[in-house]
Regions:
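A short, Lys/Arg-rich alpha-helix, primarily the initiator
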Residues: 1-26
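Residues within the alpha-helical elements of helix-turn-helix
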Residues: 30, 58
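Recognition helix of helix-turn-helix/homeodomain-like DNA-binding domains
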Residues: 32-47
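Key DNA-contacting residues within the recognition helix of helix-turn-helix
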Residues: 39-40, 53, 67
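Short, basic-rich loop-to-helix N-cap that marks the start of a DNA-contacting helix
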Residues: 44-57
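Short C-terminal boundary/hinge segments that cap the last helix of small helical domains
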Residues: 60-72
Length: 72
């Protein structure tokens, strides 16, 4: 079975955000979601697939970068 590694996504997003000298509000505007939505998802809250895909797209990497094999 495969799963999406949200923790790895947010680690990568945070590194990119810092490298670009951006706030979470600025990131949210570029992605098209609120900073509160990003923060909620970072804390383990639910997020729509479209939002997650937008976050991956913002990083400019394939979604497979964050897909992991899981046990059971």
């Amino acid at each position: 079975m495969r799963r999406f590694d949200a923790a790895a996504l947010f680690t990568a997003m945070d590194a990119q955000r810092v490298a670009r000298g951006m706030t979470w509000e600025q990131v949210g505007r570029e992605i098209g979601v609120s900073a509160a939505t990003i923060q909620r998802a970072r804390r383990g809250g639910r997020m729509e697939v479209d939002g997650m895909l937008a976050m991956v797209g913002w990083l400019g990497v394939p979604v497979e970068t964050f897909v992991r094999d899981s046990e059971h």
